[in-house]
Every structure is written in C-alpha cells, then in structure tokens.
Amino acid sequence: MAEEQAAAQEQQPAFGIEKVYVKDLSLEIPHAPQIFIQREAPQVSIELSNATAQLEEGIYEVVVTVTVTSKIADKTVFLVEVAQAGIFQIRNVPQENIDIILGVTCPNIIFPYARETISDVVTRAGFPPVLLNPVNFEALYAQQKQEQAKANGATTH
C-alpha cells in the first residue's frame, strides 16, 4: 500500500523553484561625471528577452535579460543590463505544458527580481530609479509561437 502511494506521488506533476539568482549584471555610465549636470530629460528604452536550458532531467534554467538604455540626444546617460536567472524543477508534466511553464510561468516569477535589481543599481549609480512596468509574458509567448508558425509555414512551401 505504501509503495503504491509512493509510486502515485512520483507520477504527480511537480513544479518547484530551486534558486533565483543574478547571472550577469553590468552598468555603464560612459559620460560621467559630465552627464550628471545635464538638465534635459533622458529618453529611456527597454529591451527584454528570455532563454531556457535543460540542465538535467526535470531541471531547467530560465534567464530573463533586461537591458535599459537612457540617452540624452545622442549621448548615453547609462546602460544597465541584468540577466536574472532561475533554476526550476518540472517533473511529470506533458512537454507542451513544460514549454508554457518555461515561457510564461518562470519568467513571471523571475521578472520582479530583475526589476528590483535594475531599480537598485540605477539608484546606486546616482540616478532616479527606473520603474519597469509588469510584462505580459503570456502575450509575448503567444506572439513568439505565431512568429515561429509563420516562419515554419514560409519555409515549407
């Protein structure tokens, strides 16, 4: 009886966060200290990407990379990039669900850490904090799947 329960538990879907960490972090202020006396409001641009890798059976790494560039005219005020990563355990889940978990659920867990890291680094560098809006990773995932389907459709003709 106990063996049957143990076997049934082993077949239950499992999801867990093993670790969340900063994989890479960089800050550049190429025009310091002169840039600190500029009075113009900077233009801020944000780039976002994510990547996944299977580390071993049932263990995955997901990395969300956020790059924030602040410019006044053609001069870079600062550039900060963080690669926020997480290691996740995903077991006994169908592959199509694993893809959604890795592309939506895991980035949703990791992104707030990246947002906090960027705000903290920018503030420590002497600038007002950059407050990143939440990201709809579900919409990004759907868009990525549509683009892949179009690319696959274009190459099969």
From Swiss-Prot:
Subcellular locations according to the entry: Cytoplasm
Tell me which domain of life the UniProt entry assigns to the organism this sequence originates from: Bacteria
Task: Provide the GO MF annotations for this entry.
Answer: unfolded protein binding
Keywords associated with the record? Chaperone, Cytoplasm, Protein transport, Translocation, Transport
Q: What is its main location?
A: cytoplasm
Q: Does the keyword Hydrolase apply?
A: no
Q: Name one Pfam family in it.
A: SecB
Q: Which residues form the signal peptide?
A: none
One GO BP on record is: protein transport
What does the annotation say about its assembly with partners?
Homotetramer, a dimer of dimers. One homotetramer interacts with 1 SecA dimer.
PANTHER family in UniProt = PROTEIN-EXPORT PROTEIN SECB, PTHR36918
Q: Which HAMAP family match?
A: SecB (MF_00821)
UniProt cross-references to NCBIfam families, sorted A to Z: PRK05751.1-3, PRK05751.1-4, PRK05751.1-5, secB
- Function in brief: One of the proteins required for the normal export of preproteins out of the cell cytoplasm. It is a molecular chaperone that binds to a subset of precursor proteins, maintaining them in a translocation-competent state. It also specifically binds to its receptor SecA.
- What is the name of this protein? Protein-export protein SecB
What is the species of this protein?
A: Methylobacillus flagellatus (strain ATCC 51484 / DSM 6875 / VKM B-1610 / KT)
